[in-house]
């Protein structure tokens, strides 16, 4: 009896017809892929992309040179040199470098920062041709912060209830 059932299934190509119906069912559904670089998918507010240093609205950099981000970085990708204390008792960084080749994008630096100075922004398109271009200095980080400030502030506001 089993061989008869197997012969009928083979004769009528049951698996083949089933596969055709399955293909047709998925053929008319909405596409699961997008045409990247021309189309970009949604990015979560918690996305950890290219690093940026933020400024206060008056233009002063936020980083207070506490070096918590440097201490917590598991990859030791952050290097900070603090300048001398200013008259008001605060200090700022003279050097703030991130070696993106070493960075593992864990987000610990962002979590450790008491003033939200260092953040991981929304940009994920920063491919380079040389390794030297992946060594971000303070000026590049500040430029990233200026470029992405509106989106970074929006993402931090959306994430605030969970922090």
From Swiss-Prot:
Quote the protein name from its UniProt record.
NADH-quinone oxidoreductase subunit I
Q: What is its main location?
A: membrane
User: Keywords on this record?
Assistant: 4Fe-4S, Cell inner membrane, Cell membrane, Iron, Iron-sulfur, Membrane, Metal-binding, NAD, Quinone, Repeat, Translocase, Ubiquinone
* Molecular function in Gene Ontology: 4 iron, 4 sulfur cluster binding; iron ion binding; NADH:ubiquinone reductase (non-electrogenic) activity; quinone binding
Q: Start and end of every 4Fe-4S ferredoxin-type domain?
A: 53-83, 94-123
The residues the record assigns to binding [4Fe-4S] cluster 2 are 73, 103, 106, 109
User: Could you give the subunit structure recorded for this chain?
Assistant: NDH-1 is composed of 14 different subunits. Subunits NuoA, H, J, K, L, M, N constitute the membrane sector of the complex.
Report the enzyme's class at the first EC level: translocase
Its membrane topology, per UniProt?
Peripheral membrane protein
Biological process terms from the Gene Ontology for this record are:
aerobic respiration
Organism annotation: Agrobacterium fabrum (strain C58 / ATCC 33970)
Q: Name the PANTHER family on file.
A: NADH DEHYDROGENASE [UBIQUINONE] IRON-SULFUR PROTEIN 8, MITOCHONDRIAL, NADH DEHYDROGENASE UBIQUINONE IRON-SULFUR PROTEIN 8, MITOCHONDRIAL
Taken from the UniProt entry, a GO cellular component term is: plasma membrane
Recorded catalytic activity of this chain's protein: a quinone + NADH + 5 H(+)(in) = a quinol + NAD(+) + 4 H(+)(out)
Cited InterPro entries = 4Fe4S_Fe-S-bd, 4Fe4S_Fe_S_CS, NADH_quinone_OxRdtase_chainI
Query: Species lineage, top-down?
Result: Bacteria, Pseudomonadati, Pseudomonadota, Alphaproteobacteria, Hyphomicrobiales
Gene3D superfamilies, per database record: 3.30.70.3270
Gene coding for it: nuoI
Which residues of the sequence carry a binding annotation for [4Fe-4S] cluster 1?
Answer: 63, 66, 69, 113
Localization recorded for this chain is: Cell inner membrane
What PROSITE patterns does its record include?
Answer: 4FE4S_FER_1, 4FE4S_FER_2
Q: What does this protein do?
A: NDH-1 shuttles electrons from NADH, via FMN and iron-sulfur (Fe-S) centers, to quinones in the respiratory chain. The immediate electron acceptor for the enzyme in this species is believed to be ubiquinone. Couples the redox reaction to proton translocation (for every two electrons transferred, four hydrogen ions are translocated across the cytoplasmic membrane), and thus conserves the redox energy in a proton gradient.
Q: Which family does it belong to?
A: Belongs to the complex I 23 kDa subunit family.
The EC number on file is 7.1.1.-
What the entry lists under NCBIfam families is as follows: NuoI (TIGR01971), PRK05888.1-4 (NF004538), PRK05888.1-5 (NF004539)
Q: Which cofactor does it need?
A: [4Fe-4S] cluster
User: What's the domain of life for this entry?
Assistant: Bacteria
What's the record's note on cofactor binding?
Binds 2 [4Fe-4S] clusters per subunit.
